[in-house]
Regions:
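Short N-terminal mixed-charge amphipathic segments
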Residues: 1-54
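C-terminal charged interaction modules
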Residues: 72-126
Length: 126
């Protein structure tokens, strides 16, 4: 598998993505965490909901920091990003690790954006 690259504007740096088993496992774990967050409405306990959201916010930084071997300063730069943009970065990274093409990744990101707008539209209709 050809080594993919990922440019992060906020860090002004391009990273080579390794398709190692270790990184694959981390990408699957990240996606599992995202899926659990998607089921948050099924959790009745508000404290548990907030705990899961807080943990997810940490994962958004920890996943790319671990895979890309980021410095503390680079992690801080990611922490200053808008959450939606950081989530897109993480999804892109996970899918690049898994060998998806840029076109496939763009389709996934577009679908995420459409889903978010759909959720906002349905909430505004209430």
């Amino acid at each position: 598998m050809e080594r993919a690259k990922l440019h992060i504007d906020e860090l002004n740096k391009t990273f080579k993505i390794s398709h190692t088993n270790k990184n694959m496992r981390k990408s699957y774990q990240f996606q599992l965490t995202m899926a659990k967050l998607g089921q948050l409405n099924d959790v009745d306990d508000v404290n548990e909901q907030m705990k899961q959201v807080a943990e997810y916010s940490d994962v958004l930084i920890d996943f790319p920091a671990d895979v890309l071997n980021l410095t503390d300063k680079q992690k801080e730069a990611l922490d200053e990003m808008e959450q939606d943009k950081l989530q897109e970065l993480d999804v892109t990274l996970a899918l690049k690790i898994q060998g998806m093409s840029n076109t496939q990744i763009a389709d996934v990101i577009d679908s995420m954006r459409d889903s978010e707008h759909g959720d906002a539209d349905s909430k505004s209709e209430k």
